[in-house]
């Protein structure tokens, strides 16, 4: 492993395999992928982890419904996730499954560490359990059924509003209650541990309300990782699932190589999660790590839900198959293409809040930003360069001060402004910085009128200057849009004969104005973003 570069470790949640991947799972994964690609371009040695959460009662029920064993069911689902991630250009470095031997080993090692820590005890659980969310609830947390949710008198999950099961079983408990003050201190000393900031307020309020010890083993079913010192118990699914982040970087493996990898990679810089699992990642997970003396992740970024407008009520509703309002990823790909898909969800939907989506808005954003602005700039500029300079780029100007150069002025400091936004996952803000250059370049064409300059031999130097600047703006914009749209950005560089630059890990250096060699062949090609009718 090359440890000469700084490590950057980013994760998605590992996804339940009770159903096929959907827009929500794709959303989390693309958020992480964009950050991973950006960090690679900025010189980091990136570890990007995703995977599948394959244990628990919910998975066992889904398998039984399909007439399979749980292992057969999870094996049948893994290709669906991998195929979608490949289609969406996800660049994960590892894909972990909790049924893998490495996860079994790590979880059993965790049990031994927890036993030694003194934060584990055996007791009996008597309370409510939500199978779909794999979550325990106390009597005071339970929602009573009403006319809107469930039936009157039913005990419902306060999060998903589905009926709860009453569970009574012997269990091992993790002393989560012992970590209330430690967690509040963590939030005080590291206010950016939970992002966005308003999510931190939610987490803090929950912890301040008091913590109950957590049941971390089950005896009423057997689809899980066995507790090493008690054969009748299997691991509670979240106690298992959360550990995947450390399993993937060598936790519990007794070799020099694994210990070196863990020391280099851990802690993670970002866990990307949905807001519905924030308590597991910002309360239970750090408490578990504190109990066994391990470092905490630097940031947990919780994004909102994707919502659609209910035509009857006019209200925004979370997408779900049960509501019948879910949109399949393939439907969006068919409309926008993969790169348009990535661009829309990463720049028009604010990651920290719930995002209302619609096909009308997708078309509007695609046409305005990609077809009319970015794609149009590429087509017009390459066409003029090929037409006026025999299929090549003009020579590099001897001086960038010979004529007015508004694009170079915008490019000055652009990378720094862009990186400041990307560092905090503000992809929409980063896009705005790049689009300022793209819009300016389109205006530059209209203001400088290259077609008029081409008719006057005395204006040959100015024409070359204008076209060079347009091509250089395209080159820099392509690098900055690469994390969002890797294929079309690489294609734009190829058409400039700059394809070797696509693998650069020096973003600041490669985006220095004036690096375009000049004189190289250029290719107009077909439109990268055909306008949607």
Residue ranges and their predicted role:
Residues 117-180, 184:
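Cys/His-rich short segments
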Residues 350-353, 357-361, 366, 381-430:
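Long, amphipathic alpha-helical stalk/connector segments used for oligomerization, subunit docking
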Residues 371, 375, 408, 412, ...:
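Generic structural concept
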Residues 73-93:
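A glycine-rich helix N-cap at a beta->alpha junction
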Residues 2-50, 97, 102-106, 156-387, ...:
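Structured secondary-structure scaffolds
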């Amino acid at each position: 492993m090359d440890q000469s570069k700084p490590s950057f470790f980013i994760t998605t949640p590992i996804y339940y395999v009770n159903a096929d991947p959907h827009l929500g799972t794709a959303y989390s994964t693309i958020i992480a992928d964009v950050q991973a690609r950006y960090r690679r371009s900025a010189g980091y040695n990136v570890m990007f982890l995703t995977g599948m959460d394959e244990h628990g009662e919910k998975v066992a029920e889904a398998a039984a419904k399909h007439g399979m064993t749980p292992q057969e069911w999870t094996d049948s689902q893994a290709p669906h996730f991998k195929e979608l991630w490949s289609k969406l250009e996800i660049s994960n470095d590892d894909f972990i499954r909790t049924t893998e031997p490495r996860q079994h080993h790590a979880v059993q090692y965790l049990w031994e560490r927890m036993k030694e820590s003194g934060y584990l005890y055996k007791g009996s659980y008597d309370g409510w359990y939500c199978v779909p969310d794999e979550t325990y609830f106390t009597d005071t947390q339970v929602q009573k059924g009403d006319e809107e949710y469930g039936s009157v008198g039913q005990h419902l999950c306060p999060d998903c509003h589905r009926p709860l099961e009453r569970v009574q079983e012997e269990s091992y408990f993790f002393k989560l209650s012992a970590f209330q003050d430690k967690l509040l201190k963590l939030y005080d000393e590291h206010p950016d541990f939970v992002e966005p900031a308003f999510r931190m307020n939610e987490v803090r309020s929950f912890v301040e309300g008091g913590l109950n010890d957590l049941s971390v083993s089950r005896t009423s079913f057997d689809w899980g990782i066995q507790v090493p010192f008690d054969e009748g118990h299997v691991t509670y699914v979240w106690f298992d699932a959360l550990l995947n982040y450390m399993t993937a970087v060598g936790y519990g493996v007794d070799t020099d190589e694994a210990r070196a990898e863990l020391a280099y990679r851990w802690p993670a810089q970002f866990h990307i999660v949905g807001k519905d699992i924030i308590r597991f990642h910002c309360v239970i997970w750090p408490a578990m790590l504190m109990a066994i003396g391990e470092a905490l992740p630097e940031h947990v970024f919780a994004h909102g839900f994707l919502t659609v407008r209910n035509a009857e009520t006019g209200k925004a509703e979370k997408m779900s198959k049960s509501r019948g309002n879910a949109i399949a990823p393939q439907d969006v790909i068919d409309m926008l293409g993969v790169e348009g898909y990535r661009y829309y969800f990463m720049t028009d939907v604010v990651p920290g809040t719930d995002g209302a989506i619609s096909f009308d808005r997708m078309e509007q954003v695609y046409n305005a930003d990609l077809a009319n602005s970015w794609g149009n700039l590429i087509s017009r500029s390459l066409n003029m360069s090929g037409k006026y300079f025999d299929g090549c780029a003009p020579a590099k100007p001897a001086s960038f001060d010979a004529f007015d150069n508004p694009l170079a002025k915008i490019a000055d400091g652009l990378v720094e402004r862009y990186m400041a936004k990307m560092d905090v996952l503000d992809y929409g803000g980063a896009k705005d910085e790049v689009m300022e250059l793209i819009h300016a370049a389109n205006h530059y064409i209209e203001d400088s009128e290259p077609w008029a300059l081409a008719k006057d031999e005395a204006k040959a130097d100015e024409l070359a200057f204008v076209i060079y600047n347009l091509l250089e703006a395209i080159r820099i914009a392509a690098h900055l849009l690469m994390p969002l749209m890797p294929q079309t950005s690489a294609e734009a560089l190829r058409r400039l004969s700059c394809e070797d630059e696509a693998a650069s890990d020096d973003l600041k250096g490669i985006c220095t104005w004036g690096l375009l060699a000049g004189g190289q062949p250029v290719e107009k090609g077909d439109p990268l973003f055909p306008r949607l009718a």
